[in-house]
Amino acid sequence: MSLHHVKTNKYKGFYDSYASPPATKEISKYSLKEESNKPEVIRDLIIDELLLDGNAKQNLATFCQTDLDKEIHVLMDKCIDKNMIDKDEYPQTAEIESRCVHILADLWNSPESSETIGCSTTGSSEAAMLGGMALKWRWRENRKKQGKPFDKPNIVTGPVQICWHKFALYFDIELREVPMEHDRYIMTPEEAIKRCDENTIGVIPTLGVTFTLQYEDVKGISEALDKFEKETGLDIPIHVDAASGGFVAPFLQPEIVWDFRLPRVKSINGSGHKFGLSPLGVGWVVWRGKNDIHKDLVFDVNYLGGNMPTFSLNFSRPGGQIVCQYYNFLRHGRSGYTAVHQACLDHGIFISKQVKKHGIFDIVYDGTGALPGACWKLKKDAKVKFNLFDLSDRMRNRGWQIASYTLPNLPDIVVQRVLIRHGFSHDMAMLLIEDFNRSIEYFDKHPMVQSISKDEGQSFHH
């Protein structure tokens, strides 16, 4: 037998992420240490930590898009170093943004979409605030011309997303929010008009209320404001918060008149990263015309040797989400968006029907006529051994994230809501219902001694 002499230790070059520092000791989480580390080790440690987040596929609480084409990942990688604000440095990205604005203007029935003004934002919240700022500046200018005081502006809304509360606080505006009632969960034309006066800068109906998924009656509110103007002479504009519905109604409910077909609608905001199917970080706001934005709010930047007007609250921000929005417009078209959202709507209807079969739930929203999803509450006389917070908590054992929360102004009413987005199949809906049924059976066999309180179990509903 031959003898071989080993000159070096063959294990000397051994390397493994989990057998090397810092994986073999506690890492510094809250202060920056002196030493550096191998990138692949840190990457693996962070990926492991992210596994503790919920499974996006089973997150039926969020409105944000979580199922993305592989092509979107490629485009996002190509745009990772593009700063959207540098329109002179990235002129083609700026051109793509402009195309998206005109596509949306056309989708939302702007009378002259080629002349429409609008912009991208970091999300629908920023877009909503820009729309609100334009309303305030327009109202203030008119009050100055009339020689009237302009120190007490107000907006009239239904049960709105938190961004409108922030807008009112940050920009010193009174928020007149129509409260929910036991027999009414959204703003009606009658309730809106009750709160309007000469200091109202605008009425803000929501196309897809976050709490119940329902659409508010934009056309009815517009007609009520027309009548109000004839009686009082007050011309009050409408800004539509279409964060979710703006990318659903044009495809699934084209018969609903809510957009620029109504002359009183001066601006609309929408979220590209919700039902626009784009990755997180893109919103849109479109105005009916240039006169609906006060000139003092607009800044000019150099663009292709000329000037481009800009209006935003942010400065540096990534361009990838805008490019991906353009990709989605080209990739899906009207027929694609219709097919995708119709499938989601059908799943929501299926879920609401299955939930109703238990006989212990009142269906607040059955999945028809508005956003894809469903919403329900326990019947007042339901003889059950759990509350909806308990049910949500039990469903988490199987990975499902379902929002349960009390309604604003109605702390005695707890609702549970599922929001259906692209990437959710009928098989997933059936699995959800199977786990839902098993959870209720579990509580029948194992009654809750101490139910989860609303403070402990309140879910994020936006």
Curated annotation (Swiss-Prot):
Pfam families: Pyridoxal_deC. InterPro entries: Glutamate_decarboxylase, PyrdxlP-dep_de-COase, PyrdxlP-dep_Trfase, PyrdxlP-dep_Trfase_major. GO terms for biological process: glutamate catabolic process. GO terms for cellular component: cytosol. Its cofactor is pyridoxal 5'-phosphate. The keyword Metal-binding does not apply. Its EC number is 4.1.1.15. Disruption phenotype: Mutant cells grow and develop well, forming normally proportioned fruiting bodies, but the number of viable spores is reduced to about half. It comes from the Eukaryota. Generates GABA from glutamate. GABA induces the release of acbA from prespore cells and induces the exposure of tagC on the surface of prestalk cells where it can convert acbA to SDF-2. Glutamate acts as a competitive inhibitor. PANTHER family: GLUTAMATE DECARBOXYLASE (PTHR43321:SF3). Homohexamer. Belongs to the group II decarboxylase family. This is Glutamate decarboxylase A. It comes from Dictyostelium discoideum.
